[in-house]
């Protein structure tokens, strides 16, 4: 079974900064990680390959430094890695990102396209479903369990108050949530092979054979008006006096603010 896994290198959420001029995330010089939900997608793809055979290919779109994320994916157990990188991709919204990724996916034979539910730097959860739409294949989102039965999958999809069990044939796109599994740590051998024996192949806009006006900022119908970080500062208050008085004052204050 051939599985494509889409991963994204995202800023570590503990180090998020906003450019005051462009109102977008500052990514340069910020520690980056593989998007957490994407790791769950990759782990499940590797588990499926271990059960039924096949190949796991990871694909990412981003600047050249995204190669680090792809190397980590190779160390975890992916077989091949491709990086979509080109100035033509810069400034892409979810629609233009899905356009580029779907064009890349069309170059591969695949049974499953796996991606995370959403990226922690945007939280839109749009790219996966948009890719499925552009590829004209079925999709199952919020996946928490996958079983293989021949050429079809039995998938559990999480809901707010329960779950659905869905039977779907391949090819199909799945979006993973953290309840799906616990991603493995790369082994020493895996890390060595990822950096010494495996290659990260580059795909540019020219390789996708698509009108560049449909990519990047030019191909993005969504325009970011503003981005900001929430104020995390909290005012503190100290209640003095004996314990009984302090507790009474605390209860009165909480009541006045309708907390209790």
Curated annotation (Swiss-Prot):
| Cofactor note as given | Binds 1 FAD per dimer. Binds 1 AMP per subunit.
Could you list this entry's UniProt keywords, alphabetically sorted: Electron transport, FAD, Flavoprotein, Transport
Superkingdom to which the source organism belongs: Bacteria
* Cofactors that this protein relies on: FAD; AMP
Recorded GO terms, molecular function?
electron transfer activity
Q: What does this protein do?
A: The electron transfer flavoprotein serves as a specific electron acceptor for other dehydrogenases. It transfers the electrons to the main respiratory chain via ETF-ubiquinone oxidoreductase (ETF dehydrogenase).
Q: What is the name listed in the Swiss-Prot or TrEMBL entry for this protein?
A: Electron transfer flavoprotein subunit beta
Query: What is the taxonomic lineage of the source species?
Result: Bacteria, Bacillati, Bacillota, Clostridia, Thermoanaerobacterales
Instruction: Name the gene behind this protein.
Output: etfB
């Amino acid at each position: 079974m051939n599985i494509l896994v889409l991963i994204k290198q995202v800023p570590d959420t503990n180090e998020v900064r906003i450019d005051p001029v462009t109102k977008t995330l500052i990514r340069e010089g910020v520690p980056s990680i593989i998007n957490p939900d994407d790791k769950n997608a990759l782990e499940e793809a590797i588990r499926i390959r271990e059960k039924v055979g096949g190949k796991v290919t990871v694909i990412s779109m981003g600047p050249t430094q995204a190669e680090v994320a792809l190397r980590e994916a190779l160390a975890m157990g992916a077989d091949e890695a491709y990086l979509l990188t080109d100035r033509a991709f810069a400034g892409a919204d979810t629609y233009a990102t899905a356009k580029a990724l779907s064009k890349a996916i069309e170059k591969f034979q695949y049974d499953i396209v796996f991606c995370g539910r959403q990226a922690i730097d945007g939280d839109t959860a749009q790219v996966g479903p948009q890719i499925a739409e552009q590829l004209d294949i079925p999709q199952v989102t919020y996946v928490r369990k996958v079983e293989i039965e021949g050429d079809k999958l039995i998938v559990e999809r999480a809901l707010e108050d329960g779950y659905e069990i869905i039977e779907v044939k391949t090819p199909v796109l799945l979006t993973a949530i953290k309840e799906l599994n616990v991603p493995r740590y790369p082994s020493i051998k895996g890390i060595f092979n990822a950096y010494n024996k495996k290659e990260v192949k580059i795909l540019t806009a020219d390789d996708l054979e698509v009108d560049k006006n449909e990519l990047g900022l030019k191909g993005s119908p969504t325009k970011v008006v503003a981005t900001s970080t929430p104020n995390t500062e909290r005012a503190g208050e100290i209640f003095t006096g004996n314990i009984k008085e302090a507790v009474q004052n605390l209860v009165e204050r909480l009541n006045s603010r309708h907390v209790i």
